[in-house]
Each structure stands twice: as C-alpha cells, then as structure tokens.
Amino acid sequence: MCIRDRVQSEQGILGGIYGGKKSNFLKCKKFLNSFCKSVFNFGDVSKASSAKLLSNFLSLMTTTTVIEFFKSAKKLNIDIKLLCDVARLGSGNSGALDRIADKAIKGNYKGYVFSVDNTYKDLNYINDLVSDLPNANKLSKMAKSFYKQASIKGFGNLLVSELIDKEKY
C-alpha cells in the first residue's frame, strides 16, 4: 500500500506500507523503492492494512480541520494568509495545511487531491476499525458525517479541499 497519490509516485516520494511474509519483504521493497521514498514493514497484512487506515485517519482529520479553518476564517472575515502564517509557526502546521493553503489563498481549491467520496469511503473503514475506541470512534463518525452530507449534496466527485468554497454541506 502506498501513501499519497500518482504525482508523488512519479516523483518517487511515496511512503510504502508493507504487510506480508518477512521473507518477501526485501523483494517487494526493491520494487516499491522505484516509486517510494521509504517503505515500512508492519508485519502481517492485517497490521499493514490497519496502519494504512490509521495513517489516513490522521491525514483526513487534519485535512478536515484545515478545511473548516479556512471556512471559519472566511465567515469571520479574517485574513487567511495572515492566519496561515501564524498557524505555520505553531502546532497547527501540517502537511494538510501545506498542501491546501498556498493554492487556496489564491482561490485554487484543488490542493488536496482526494475526493469527497473516497474520503467518506475511507472514514467508513476507519470508523469500523476504531469502533471499540470511544473517542476515536466519535471523531471518525463526526468527520464521516461531514463527507456524507457533502456527497448527498452532490459534491462527492469534488476534491475535499474544494469544499472550502462551498457554503454549506
């Protein structure tokens, strides 16, 4: 499994997650290194799958927060460039902010290349994975409800960062 998308694959900077027999790891790693910056062995397939979903959980929750950060700043008429500059100096700095901010400040909301429907699908899997962890389950359900509503409103094919430009979903 790989982390990120086709563009990063072509650049050879993906993160690879391996799950399977230890004896096959080196063979697979050699192949994965042709398009991955790093490859991580999580042991068996189920742990690798869970690791991928947990990685997506962190990414999607952070991305959802960045989207709502932009929407809130717009609604409150706060200079988003200045606010992003402040966020980047503290704990609010993140890969999601970096992928979205510079383009969104200029009115291009295609910075996070992952669709609303794919996000909703992943959050369903994540919600199942963390079903016995009360707080993680609540967080994933909350985010899942955002993307479910966006999909119902016809935004399923949009990139998640394009939701910044939608008033309500």
What are these regions (language model features)?
Residues 4-56:
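Rossmann-fold dinucleotide-binding core
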Residues 46-162, 166-169:
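Helical "substrate-binding/catalytic lid" subdomain
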